[in-house]
A protein has these predicted regions:
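Class I S-adenosyl-L-methionine-dependent methyltransferase catalytic core
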Residues: 1-110
């Protein structure tokens, strides 16, 4: 079942940090909702999440992205089973948002 954002976050209160691997199609909404309930967020997302003018305007132009932790090896994700990278492996990263941070993010390779 595909969950809507409200079904996942309706009962979320205030936290210091959120660590999540959100559904890609709702990732922007998770970040925006995360700013309402936590100071810091770490989200495992495709590296391509950093692309796009609309996402830049709504998220990245606010300067709250503190760090980008880029996996040096591509990752294959299939139903929680770790596998050898294949041709359809994807570039992933951890994005670290901090709503009190204002500035340019630092890049890290992991």
């Amino acid at each position: 079942k595909d969950l809507e954002l409200d079904e996942v976050t309706y009962n979320v209160k205030n936290y210091d940090v959120i660590v999540t691997n959100p559904p890609y199609k709702l990732a922007k909404e998770f970040v925006l909702r995360g700013f309402e309930v936590a100071r810091e967020q770490y989200l495992l997302l495709r590296l391509s999440f950093l692309e796009g003018q609309k996402r830049y305007q709504e998220l990245f132009s606010k300067k709250h992205l503190k760090g980008v932790y880029i996996f040096t090896a591509r990752i294959t994700c299939s139903e929680g089973i770790e596998e050898t990278p294949t041709a359809n492996s994807v570039a992933y990263c951890w994005l670290h948002f901090d709503k009190e941070f204002v500035g340019q993010p630092t890049l890290y390779w992991i």
